[in-house]
């Protein structure tokens, strides 16, 4: 390409990141190519074939090549001469065939001539509608460009549409956009293109997957060859020929085909083309799935691709709730059905076996890398055989009972008859889609709306976001909170158990390694001992349910683990607790008859109709007998709607890992009569997986836990982590948990003896291994891989194994499925030790490793490019999960030049650099890297996390709506606004933590003179044991009973942020007037807050700028990365949210979602099930005061409105042993005292919060 064309290409190819919302499929291959390792030497940029280069003909392959040609209607490339990448002329025969060798000037002249002919100005045509009607058959279906040298045909038989190599307004070329979205992989060049009508395919094996194809230049001759990455490049298919395999380069670079292969349209052509946005591309591609002949004009028809109503923070009633969520569940169900039914595999090789239950089991390999869907045990598949001369056609449905690390699937068949066990080849497999889980979600929402007994009135209103008086469950607390069979609880765990037992609805936030499961088991134990009936324990995944069931069983409670029938054959660590196991091993008189019938059924495969009826009745009676005798029933959230529990009612429900479940999924166990619910999870880690992007954009990916947090229900945070080496927990604690995580393990406990691994800093078992290799698109087209990182992962694994670490201690994790599959194959091929050792190493995606841990973690980041960003590595929750899986040590491989552009990653890299753990070079001679970091970009909200929000143009100090759930997709700011890239999900936004998590709207007192919030004016929903309360005069709304409300002076001591360790400098300023409070429209939007605030809320030493300043003045210093400098943000409702910069050194941990410092409870009296409860005045401190509310209708004695005889009961500022600061000075005024704070003149006319009697 000449310099002029290069300039035009650069100008026309800038990605419109505002428009491109298809963020998951970011698959750029542009980037730094400075390979420091001999495995994959590469020039600085992808080489462009020079003059007189020829592409070898597939028909002229060497002896090692495939014999068969893969010609269809088009020829394979035979010979190519290219003038500096300007184009090529293909001969139809041997080298220099009929076309001969054409010069670059001829090609340029031809291209210029075509351009002049097609795009001449016509005076009355403004160019906007060019290509609207696709004048030629080969015009790009997106933009209408029809230059033969610039267009490519999708060669899938059902498609055969043409697309150009122009980006237009998207971040990738139109042809690559189409291939990815449609999941197509074959292309053919135009017959009038310089290369002729050519199907791109591998020279050696004929593979036509363009995402696998690259080219190699010969060492001596001016010839290039197309070769696929896997298997031909990886197995060195051309080792006996004169090819330099180290110079292999992919055909798709920076989301475009290489310009010497498919020209990029000129700037003039692109300006005259139809302008199409990424959103329009997404919509037309979706439409083509059902109507292949649809055009862009069809998108404008009413009812086409309407966005569903987004999830709300609050709902008027359960019917509105159902009307919002039901369409989203249907969208997800339809997408799941379409995806599963479209996934099929042909020509499988099957090996046969017989299971312990005498059923046939088929084993076959089902590669994960090529599939968007992940198989899990219990999935239904249909195995088919088309038949041959000897065997008839056959098919049978079965359940997946096992998945191996080598991607082998064990499928247990339902029927044993007619199975072709003497055949091993030529099988096909399809998914069998079942709607059970989606049907149960819809049913739960219906019950929630129509059945008043489905949940208590209080929980009903809390779930809908209505403001009701806080209540307290009347329970006798145990003398001690320790539980037999479990480890001794620490102070924050005891605090969580104590608080949960007395509240109708509770949230427990468990950061990594803090003992969520142990705490949950302790809560369940105490609930069961209260004698209020059986406790239902759920989680979204079977693994989480099994872990919790095992812990609860260890306490001595009788536990039944209810499995889906499709999973009864799946091996489980708690097999002895499962219902089907207990049915088989129950020793009763009826059992003997049931056992005989079961044995008969296993042997014969079926029973007579009378025996079958008798068998089912006996089995059903036995199951009911076992479940009724249990103290605790454990199942998945979806499993709670199992017919075997249809007549059960559960007053108390605990849902573990609730942040990984969708809201309708959480609702299933709640509508079984719940009166007390506990949600356990961590919204700072990854949430539920939603496959349908339209449903995810509307908010289905938001968990119930997150929504309740945004509504002001404060999670109780567990604060002592027992997993990570203290050096490993430092950054996650400071960046994701405000420095509040304390270490329950010492450095000595996390040092291993006899392990000789070359850590750069001996007492810090961590380092960032600098990699500058190129990222590439995976075979699926929807993921990435990085061959350089994969090669060095193998070197690291080998070094760990040689140093004495066993394979089961090592975990390799990566965000991308393409890299996961490549690492598995690479280690199997290239590992220098025994192959079996590498097979035992677990290689997994970051998302699938949530909740897991290993002694040593190797994290491969993959992304390495100049322009395309880092994809969903942007998500701070994914980084949090990745950094917190290791117990003893972690190694991160990545490209700092690319990762440092994102502020959070910049902080991580700075942290590693300051501790001398940023290294490069060979493993046996690591040295500190001097690589220069990029200036971090400003980060804003992302639709993947902020539901209803999106990128756009806003003014520098304009955050738009103060509603955290407001839909701002169409927002555009005033002239002079700053550009918002469609970017990472850790942007600052009202009502959201700067790292991307919802924050509670809770009052920070004292703030006299603020506006009260009004109670939700709705009818009550039946009594739940509450007592009417008289409103307190002079103190109304959300802050009632908690000191003064928002809006007045902020005492100096509450605004001061103290230095804690090396977290960073502090903010130290009083707010002297109400006018200095941040506005509800945008947190930290005032310049006065800017001395240490970075754009996304993360603070780095040395940065001095406005929160919304456009210019980053400096970067990095001796101060580690700190995200705790958030003093006094305002929530959308006008209530201040206090982020205290406190660290992990024993000081009080601040006010963000922290209730672990409850110092104690006052005595209470009363005869009701639920007692009212108020936070103390310093709302963030998490102290509760509880007073006895005595129903005045039953006691005529002299009582004040709160039923408290001794006002001093209200001031319980007990010091907590967890923290070094006593806090007795908070809330020293009794709530019913009419002090000066309560008599603000502007409050006298406000409506008080009405008592709630439902």
UniProtKB/Swiss-Prot annotation:
Segments of skewed composition (Gly residues): 84-100, 1036-1046
Post-translational modification: Highly phosphorylated in S/TQ-enriched N-terminal and C-terminal regions; required for formation of mRNA surveillance complexes.
Species of provenance: Arabidopsis thaliana
Protein name (database record): Regulator of nonsense transcripts 1 homolog
Binding positions (Zn(2+) 3): 202, 205, 228, 232
Compositional bias per record (Pro residues), positions renumbered to this chain: 1000-1014
Similarity section: Belongs to the DNA2/NAM7 helicase family.
Keyword terms of this UniProt record: ATP-binding, Cytoplasm, Helicase, Hydrolase, Metal-binding, Nonsense-mediated mRNA decay, Nucleotide-binding, Phosphoprotein, Plant defense, RNA-binding, Zinc, Zinc-finger
Region (CC/SHH/C): 154-184
Location relative to the cell: Cytoplasm; Cytoplasm, P-body
Any GO CC annotation of this UniProt entry: cytosol
PANTHER family: DNA2/NAM7 HELICASE FAMILY, REGULATOR OF NONSENSE TRANSCRIPTS 1
Gene: UPF1
